[in-house]
Amino acid sequence: MSFDLAARLAARRAEHLYRQRPLLQSPQGPQVVVDGQPLLAFCNNDYLGLANHPQVIEAWRSGASRWGVGGGASHLVIGHSTPHHALEEALAELTGRPRALLFTTGYMANLGAVTALVGQGDTVLEDRLNHASLLDAGLLSGARFNRYLHNDAHSLAKRLEKATGNTLVVTDGVFSMDGDVADLPALARATKARGAWLMVDDAHGFGPLGANGGGLVEHFGLGLDEVPVLVGTLGKAFGTAGAFVAGSEDLIESLIQFARPYIYTTSQPPALACATLKSLELLRSEHWRREHLAALIRQFRQGAEQIGLQLMDSFTPIQPILVGDSARAVRLSQMLRERGIMVSAIRPPTVPAGSARLRVTLSAAHSEAQVQLLLSALADCFRELQAEPSHA
């Protein structure tokens, strides 16, 4: 018996679900070159426009000159350098928590935290729309795994009644495909009432949300008691790469001892930590970035509603336009690209069947004029698609 990979690939093509990697031939930013074509992009997660910031680039360059290029070893051997330590202290300060721990990727942070905290005989409860890394972590933990209805504290409470052992409730802060936010106060109340812990992956909230860019937990004014485990990524609003878990002294020490994705991997380049420290400095000093981004979000939503587009409930930089049919979403993405604008079509299995969408993401690096160009192109494309015979 052999693996029939060709048949699997053919089936995916037939369902309009086949994915290909665009080749980026320029730095990240609103104006990019993809597969040789200049495009105005609305599909990256560089929410504050820091990925190509000259000061961040210089911090990386000078960090490489001082500390070299590679991490060289795992953190527990000889890979934990002074820049790593300084970044962990800065992230602890940003989150208002005693400690923070660096991970190489967001996927590894989620996998490491969940599997270190729960196992056989325990329970992990997750929002049904959580990121794949969180769902995988729950499944791989060995704990009893169950999902509650999306953003539904009542559904969570019913499942908490049946939980056994140490119980970890896990949710995204901002849901990456819908752009809506978790009702953290309600989830925290339900979780705390049953003596469970709440873990929040705020990958898309850090930077854009909160009074100081501290994310959704800061937005709601929640502390360590309500959210004992807080995860963030550095490759989105901070414009670099990596991730972290923030929490109590005991939590971080436990992760150092028991989180296998932390223990058994080489540390990130020290120069990368230098660059991220500069990003954090810019987050504190350049408040206009968050203010400008908020204005662009308002501009886009008002314009999209005037066109009659079906938006989702989001006040974040993630602004999905619900299309429904996968082939139609791909067609709209292609039509936009023909007009020099890049917006990704998101299809199953990333989103539920029948809910394909265009996923617009906005950045502080965009201008009001660029957002208006996007709105005009969307109006033209939707009007043109409706006039085509197959969609009339």
From Swiss-Prot:
The keyword Isomerase does not apply. It is an enzyme of class 2 (transferase). SUPFAM superfamilies: PLP-dependent transferases. Substrate binds at R19, H131, T350. It catalyses: 6-carboxyhexanoyl-[ACP] + L-alanine + H(+) = (8S)-8-amino-7-oxononanoate + holo-[ACP] + CO2. InterPro entries: Aminotrans_II_pyridoxalP_BS (IPR001917), Aminotransferase_I/II_large (IPR004839), AON_synthase_class-II (IPR050087), AONS_Archaea/Proteobacteria (IPR004723), AONS_Proteobacteria (IPR022834), PyrdxlP-dep_Trfase (IPR015424), PyrdxlP-dep_Trfase_major (IPR015421), PyrdxlP-dep_Trfase_small (IPR015422). The modification N6-(pyridoxal phosphate)lysine is found at K236. It holds the Pfam family Aminotran_1_2. Signal peptide: none annotated. GO terms for biological process: biotin biosynthetic process. Pathway: Cofactor biosynthesis; biotin biosynthesis. Transmembrane segments: none annotated. Pyridoxal 5'-phosphate binds at G106, Y107, S176, H204, T233. Its EC number is 2.3.1.47. Keywords: Biotin biosynthesis, Pyridoxal phosphate, Transferase. Its cofactor is pyridoxal 5'-phosphate. CDD domains: KBL_like (cd06454). It comes from the Bacteria. One of its GO terms (molecular function) is 8-amino-7-oxononanoate synthase activity. Homodimer. Catalyzes the decarboxylative condensation of pimeloyl-[acyl-carrier protein] and L-alanine to produce 8-amino-7-oxononanoate (AON), [acyl-carrier protein], and carbon dioxide. Belongs to the class-II pyridoxal-phosphate-dependent aminotransferase family. BioF subfamily. This is 8-amino-7-oxononanoate synthase. It comes from Pseudomonas fluorescens (strain ATCC BAA-477 / NRRL B-23932 / Pf-5).
